[in-house]
């Protein structure tokens, strides 16, 4: 196996199967199912539950159409991931791809922006878990539940990627079962009692429908998909080559999109309030999904979904924390972060210090937010900007590698120009529609990244071309 240290190239062979791991390399133990489990855990199969009411109000009742459009939009990004993982099958995901396609400087900025979200998305998920558990057991403060969730999932990640994947599979199976219970219950109620709205309304909208409203809602709905890209960060730990990673990225997105479309379509048919009524009552939007379940099926399903969300959120954070650890590991291996973080534990085969570093930052952010009444709003308002910026650089990397540098032969224009340009354009529009606080945080984080890059460049590493 050729060395990867310092160059980012050459992790092509399988890792050791014994108890030791070559320095700077991760152990290849993950299969296709494991990759899909990590992706779906990070996304969460019932991710639309919390924002269903907001999307229904914004889109004029066409919430299922919103998720159809959002799946197509994010499909462009998934396709670009699939292109780049084949030419750079290494840990680090978009950091590695931007280095390959655009150069060292752009690679660092892409990784730096992605790191913002890889640290904050798990913090939001941990906070969701703490809030849900506090609602079930109010005697224990939500910040304590939040800290417990961080501790348990961090221990699982340190145990090893294969062990964490096995536990994650059990949790994911539980979430899928709860979702199936909702689907079956909703179908029974609809057959027995009929729908609260027209059968096509979730696809065509009501009197307040407009395509502009749908696109505005899509800018919110794409947040449900953040996390599928984490699959690419495990590229050095998968058996069977980079094609398996590419297939897992695309499969995970299509499966998650299908689940989102089905559940929002059924929930919209059960929703007793019209989209106009929801738009006029913002306080009702957050609980709209649960209110529809209560009114049509019963509170027992409400409680079942709530427990599923509490456990599922913690394990969504587990997958996010694991991905954050791999990103930190990859950047440290290239000496963009302290090289100590690139060490791989010889027993578990995971980047232990990188995971611990990510866990500490996430713990501080999550507990800080859990102790504030407005903490959730602060985190949610800024959580997407880093990933969206990194996705734009991902699309640019495809053009840079296949078209500008022509490193893989003649480009295929629809794959290497049309799809990346359309995908980047849509993402730029979403960034423009982001909240002011998200844009400010993103710009500040970007400015710090440029300062770090300038310092590293002055030391001779910042602007060199990728090998």
Regions found by a protein language model. Name each.
Residues 1-53, 57-62, 74-75, 79, ...:
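Membrane-interface "cap" regions at the ends of multi-pass membrane proteins
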Residues 21, 63-64, 141, 170-306:
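Helix-loop-helix junctions that connect adjacent transmembrane segments
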Residues 48-142, 255, 262, 390, ...:
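Extracellular loop-to-transmembrane helix junctions
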Residues 90, 113-126, 225, 229-238, ...:
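Membrane-helix boundary/coupling elements in multi-pass transport proteins
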Residues 95-99, 105, 126-145, 178, ...:
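Helix-loop-helix connectors at the membrane interface of multi-pass transporters/channels
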Residues 96, 103, 135, 248-320, ...:
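TM-loop-TM module centered on a large, flexible mid-protein loop between adjacent transmembrane helices
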Residues 143-196, 249-254, 384-393, 415, ...:
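Membrane-interface loop-to-helix entry segments
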């Amino acid at each position: 196996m050729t060395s990867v240290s310092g160059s980012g190239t050459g992790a092509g062979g399988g890792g050791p199967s014994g108890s030791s791991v070559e320095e700077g390399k991760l152990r290849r133990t993950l299969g296709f199912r494991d990759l899909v489990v990590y992706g779906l855990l990070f996304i969460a199969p019932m991710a639309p539950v919390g924002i269903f009411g907001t999307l229904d109000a914004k889109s004029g009742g066409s919430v299922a159409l919103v998720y159809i459009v959002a799946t197509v939009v994010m499909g462009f990004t998934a396709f670009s991931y699939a292109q780049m993982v084949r030419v750079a099958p290494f840990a680090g995901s978009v950091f590695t791809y931007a280095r390959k396609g655009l150069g060292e400087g752009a690679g660092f900025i892409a990784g730096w922006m992605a790191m913002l979200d890889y640290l904050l998305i798990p913090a939001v998920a941990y906070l969701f878990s703490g809030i849900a558990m506090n609602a079930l057991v109010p005697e224990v403060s939500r910040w304590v539940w939040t800290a417990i969730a961080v501790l348990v999932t961090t221990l699982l990640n340190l145990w090893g990627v294969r062990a964490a994947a096995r536990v994650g599979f059990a949790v994911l199976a539980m979430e899928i079962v709860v979702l199936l219970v909702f689907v079956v219950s909703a179908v029974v109620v609809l057959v027995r009692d009929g729908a609260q709205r027209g059968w096509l309304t979730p696809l065509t909208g009501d009197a307040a429908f407009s395509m502009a409203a749908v696109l505005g809602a899509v800018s919110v709905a794409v947040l449900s998909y953040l996390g599928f890209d984490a699959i690419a960060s495990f590229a050095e730990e998968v058996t069977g080559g980079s094609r398996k990673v590419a297939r897992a990225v695309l499969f995970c997105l299509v499966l998650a999109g299908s689940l989102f479309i089905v559940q929002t379509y059924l929930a919209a048919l059960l929703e007793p309030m019209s989209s106009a009524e929801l738009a006029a009552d913002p306080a009702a939007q957050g609980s709209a999904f649960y209110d529809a379940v209560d009114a049509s099926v019963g509170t027992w399903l409400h409680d079942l979904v709530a427990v599923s969300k509490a456990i599922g959120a913690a394990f969504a954070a587990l997958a996010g924390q694991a991905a954050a650890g791999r990103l930190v590991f990859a950047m440290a291996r290239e000496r963009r972060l302290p090289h100590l973080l690139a060490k791989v534990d010889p027993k578990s085969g995971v980047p232990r210090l990188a995971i611990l570093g990510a866990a500490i930052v996430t713990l501080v952010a999550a507990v800080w937010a859990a102790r504030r009444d407005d903490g959730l709003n602060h985190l949610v308002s800024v959580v997407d900007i880093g990933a969206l910026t990194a996705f734009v650089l991902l699309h640019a990397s495809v053009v840079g590698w296949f078209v500008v540098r022509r490193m893989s032969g003649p480009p295929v224009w629809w794959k290497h120009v049309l799809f990346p340009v359309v995908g980047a354009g849509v993402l730029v529009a979403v960034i423009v529609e982001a909240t002011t606080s998200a844009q400010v945080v993103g710009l500040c984080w970007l400015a710090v990244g440029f300062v770090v890059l300038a310092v590293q460049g002055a030391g001779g590493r910042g602007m060199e071309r990728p090998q």
